[in-house]
Amino acid sequence: MLKGRNLLDPMDFSLEELEEVFKLADEIIEEPEKFLHVCDGKILATLFYEPSTRTRFSFEAAMLRLGGQVIGFSEPNSSSVAKGESVADTIRTVGCYADIAAMRHPKEGAPAIAAMYSDIPVINAGDGSHQHPTQTLTDLLTIRSLKGDLSNLTIGCCGDLKFGRTVHSLVKALSRYKNNKFVFMSPEELKIPDYIRKEILEKNNIEYKEVSKMEDAMAELDILYMTRVQRERFFNEDDYVRLKDSYILDGEKMKYAKKDMMVLHPLPRVNEIAYEIDQDPRGCYFKQAKYGMYVRMALIAKLLGVR
């Protein structure tokens, strides 16, 4: 039973519990009209201390399509946070009005602190460069739906692997499935963190390698997970400008790829995927965005215990 649980890290749910969420998402995709009123009378609070388009809209659309309502803020300056209110006090107050909360915060661990003080389920909608578990559920549902399996895959992760919380969460999650391998492509300054390399991959004897050129790995990949270099994580603008266009996926590089490879991206993109890839059937990032709404619908329904 997932009722009343928090989702702070992709490892919080067992593989069986994840499959439970995915099966419900499948049902919602097949017959959405059956779920139009399952959250009647329920309220989701979206507590976004950082800018967001897809994640916030996806959560809000998910709750509305389940028949529930949404309250919240999209920037801290529009709430009592601007007056210095703590995360603990904010979630305690919000718990008086809402049944479930989704929180995005620039500080790592902030949603976990909120969960400690909360009487309602808390979903981590991204905390700093740490984790983004609902994006991971989105990615897993997309791969599962389009590939048919989450095992025996070679996954390439490209771009900002140091600050990219979506990559950290995805590697952790896919490491739990059988016979998956990873290829990491990034500038030296933005390499995958040591804790992912040592505590997740090496500790569990999971095969991985790091390459400097995309072309060196494209032919073996089943999934290519592109990420942008995140301007908001840099203190030095010169460093950002120097690194932002390090890896760009275009039609020429796609010539090296398998016919059934999938290109994913958590979005927003900047320059790292050329617009010509939008016309390539292997470009699955907008399908991925839609799967994000469905998996959040399933997650909300499970945590509230209405399904």
Swiss-Prot record:
Protein name: Aspartate carbamoyltransferase catalytic subunit
Its biological purpose: Catalyzes the condensation of carbamoyl phosphate and aspartate to form carbamoyl aspartate and inorganic phosphate, the committed step in the de novo pyrimidine nucleotide biosynthesis pathway.
Gene3D superfamilies the record matches: Aspartate/ornithine carbamoyltransferase
Sites where the protein binds carbamoyl phosphate: 54-55, 104, 132, 135, 267-268
One of the Pfam families matching this protein, by short name: OTCace
Quaternary state and interactors: Heterododecamer (2C3:3R2) of six catalytic PyrB chains organized as two trimers (C3), and six regulatory PyrI chains organized as three dimers (R2).
Pathway: Pyrimidine metabolism; UMP biosynthesis via de novo pathway; (S)-dihydroorotate from bicarbonate: step 2/3
GO MF annotation terms: amino acid binding; aspartate carbamoyltransferase activity
UniProt enzyme class: transferase
Binding site for L-aspartate: 83, 165, 228
GO biological process: 'de novo' pyrimidine nucleobase biosynthetic process; 'de novo' UMP biosynthetic process; amino acid metabolic process
Keyword Transferase part of the UniProt annotation: yes
Residues of the signal peptide: none
TM segment ranges: none
UniProt keyword list: Pyrimidine biosynthesis, Transferase
InterPro entries: Asp/Orn_carbamoyltranf_P-bd, Asp/Orn_carbamoylTrfase, Asp/Orn_carbamoylTrfase_sf, Asp_carbamoyltransf, Asp_carbamoyltransf_Asp/Orn-bd
